[in-house]
Structure formats: C-alpha cells, structure tokens
C-alpha cells in the first residue's frame, strides 16, 4: 500500500481518537459541575438551617426568661404592698423602693369592681399615695398572687440573645387579707390586668388595673 495512503489513514484515526476523547470530557464536565453545585447548595442549606435553629433557640430562651421576669413583677408588687401596710419607716421605705423598681414613671393605674367607684391614678407617686392611705388605718396585710398568665406581644433580641425591646400583657389572680380592728379581717379577691414593656434593660409595668371580683369582712376566731 502506498506510504502516503497509510499516513493519511493513521492521521485520520489519530484525529478521530482525539475528537472522541474531547467529546467524552465535554460530556462529563456538566455532570461533574452539577455535582459540585449540588454539594455547594447542600452546604449552604445546612448553614442556613443551622442558623435558623440557632436563632430559634436564642428566641425560645429569651421568651422563657421574659416570662419569668414579667411574672415576678407582680409578685414583687404584692410583697411591696404588704411592706407599705406596716407602720415602721424602714418597711415603708423598702416598699416604696420596690415600687420605683417595678413601675415605669408614666404608670397609669386604676381600681374598679362591683359596687366600687372607679379610682384612677397617674404616676408611681399617685398609686403609692392611694395604697398607703388605704392601708394606713388597717393592720398587717397579706397579698397572695395566684394564677398568672403572660402574653408576649413583641420581643426583639440582639445577636447574643439579649432582649432589647418587648411588650407583654400580664394577668394575675389576687387574694388579699387585711386585718381590721375588733379582730376582723377583710378578704378581697380580684385580678391584676397589667401591661409591661422592656426598656432600659428591664421589664416594667406601665399600666395596671386592679379588678375587684368579690370581698367580705369576717370575724376572726369564731
């Protein structure tokens, strides 16, 4: 066979082989690219889900702590009110200090119920005056806080899970015992309807409405 013809055949086979190898590489490249893209997407999804779980855990912890702190406001109020019912200056000063700590300066408070003329007071000093004047003629008192329900309306946290802003409603059942002269006791049942907000690093009550449900005067030691 002519040498030129053989060279042409060999050259053709070589070019055909090169072309086939190039096509094979081109066919694999999209698949490999797709696999790489899928792997990257899965990594991004995992990171996103991880961040969401992290944020959710932070928010759950913040809501739990907020609920405890909000409930404690009304409990401290009950304790402070009992202190104000005592006659010694030290107890009155402690009760007043707690009021300043749990109430916001723009406090709006009221007392209402069946057979009672609604009383409204503005500011901490206004409510403090009403309480001290009401409890003054009585003996020791005991304000018991029962069932409490917290409804968080708004809650914002920073990147570290710290609360920076919040609004909530607080409902607390009340049972209050007030000693009277002649071995008598005045028992009152009611509900505190309070609104609280988070500002300056703490929760405070800015609105509190005391609803009297029922009351009676009893003779002790009968």
Model-derived regions, located:
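Classical Sec-dependent N-terminal signal peptides that target proteins to the secretory pathway
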Residues: 1-23
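Short beta-strand edge/turn micro-motifs at domain boundaries
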Residues: 29, 33-35, 39-43, 162-171, ...
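Short, low-complexity N-terminal intrinsically disordered segments enriched in polar/charged residues
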Residues: 27-101
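Short, solvent-exposed loop/turn segments that connect beta-strands within catalytic domains
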Residues: 87-92, 156-166, 181-184, 200-204
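A solvent-exposed, acidic/Ser-Thr-rich amphipathic alpha-helical stretch
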Residues: 93-173
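Residues that flank catalytic or metal-binding motifs in active/ligand-binding sites
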Residues: 73-76, 103-105, 144-146, 188-192, ...
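Short, cysteine-centered beta-strand-loop-beta hairpins and adjacent loop/turn segments enriched
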Residues: 137, 176-187, 215-216
């Amino acid at each position: 066979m002519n040498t030129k013809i053989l060279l042409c055949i060999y050259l053709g086979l070589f070019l055909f082989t090169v072309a086939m190898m190039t096509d094979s590489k081109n066919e694999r490249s999209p698949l490999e690219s797709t696999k790489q893209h899928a792997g990257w997407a899965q990594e991004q999804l995992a990171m996103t889900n991880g961040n969401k779980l992290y944020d959710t855990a932070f928010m759950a912890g913040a809501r739990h702590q907020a609920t405890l702190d909000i409930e404690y406001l009304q409990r401290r109020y009950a304790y402070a009110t009992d202190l104000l019912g005592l006659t010694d200056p030290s107890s009155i000063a402690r009760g007043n200090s707690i009021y300043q700590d749990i109430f916001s300066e723009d406090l709006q408070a009221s007392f209402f119920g069946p057979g009672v003329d609604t009383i409204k007071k503005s500011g901490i000093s206004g409510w403090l005056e009403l309480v001290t004047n009401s409890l003054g003629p009585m003996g020791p008192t005991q304000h018991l806080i029962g069932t409490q329900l917290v409804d968080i309306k708004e809650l914002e946290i920073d990147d570290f899970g710290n609360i920076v802003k919040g609004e909530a409603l607080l409902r607390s059942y009340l049972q209050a015992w007030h000693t009277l002269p002649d071995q008598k006791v005045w028992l009152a049942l009611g509900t505190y309807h309070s609104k609280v907000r988070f500002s300056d690093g703490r929760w405070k009550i800015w609105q509190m409405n005391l609803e009297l449900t029922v009351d009676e005067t009893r003779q002790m030691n009968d």
